[in-house]
């Protein structure tokens, strides 16, 4: 049985679409982070492979993982409402590399990434995971710095226009926060990719990389902070 740890605000239609791939479980807000991203999965936890990291003070998330029987590692880095104290877990691994704003990234996560043989690559954008839709070695982002770093790392990467993604309370969301890994070869989007100006280009890019694309609703893309998939 697979599970998706999701933003509690994720709409019912998207939950129903996700239910074909696994059960949705809402993550409670974490009061150390700013509203509304305090309920975004990509701000609350991160994964390297099957290994999950969670903020030490985010006990509600830890209880959910324990209930599911999922082992996890704690991030000891202090969390705060102001950037970059909110991005300790906003990082990702792809193609043998680990990307994040390393000065703000959890020490436990960086140490584990090194143990796994990943090459650490620092970028300026602290919301690294938020900024990228990732599947295998394929990365799509609107952030020029991440685009250059991923390209230098030899990954397959596509640069798209910024904005055009909704988010609660802010001017624009991120593509990574509007996407979710459904399985090893399938990437889902919270909304209709065809309503994004680079939507068809994004779809073609992932399909060329052998990744199927699934739109989880007919609405414009919306950043719910992605999801943590537990198998």
Mark where each language-model region is.
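Histidine/cysteine-enriched polar flanking segments
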Residues: 1-231
């Amino acid at each position: 049985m697979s599970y998706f740890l999701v933003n509690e605000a994720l709409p019912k239609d998207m939950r129903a679409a996700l239910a074909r791939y696994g059960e949705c479980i809402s993550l409670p807000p974490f009061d150390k982070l700013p509203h509304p991203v305090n309920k975004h999965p990509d701000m609350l936890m991160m994964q390297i492979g099957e290994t999950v990291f969670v903020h030490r003070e985010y006990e509600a998330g830890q209880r959910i993982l324990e209930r599911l029987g999922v082992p996890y590692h704690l991030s000891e880095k202090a969390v705060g409402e102001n950037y970059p104290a909110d991005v300790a877990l906003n990082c990702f691994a792809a193609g043998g590399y680990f990307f994040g704003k390393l000065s703000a990234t959890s020490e436990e996560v960086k140490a584990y990434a090194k143990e796994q043989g990943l090459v650490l690559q620092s970028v300026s954008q602290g919301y690294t995971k938020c900024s990228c839709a990732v599947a295998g070695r394929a990365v799509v982002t609107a952030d020029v710095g991440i685009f250059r770093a991923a390209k230098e790392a030899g990954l397959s990467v596509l640069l798209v226009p910024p904005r055009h993604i909704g988010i609660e309370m802010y001017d624009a969301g991120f593509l990574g926060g509007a996407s979710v890994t459904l399985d090893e070869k399938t990437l889902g989007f919270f909304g209709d990719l065809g309503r994004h100006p680079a939507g068809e280009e994004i779809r073609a890019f992932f399909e060329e990389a052998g990744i199927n694309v699934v739109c989880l609703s007919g609405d414009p893309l919306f950043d719910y902070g992605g999801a943590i998939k537990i198998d």
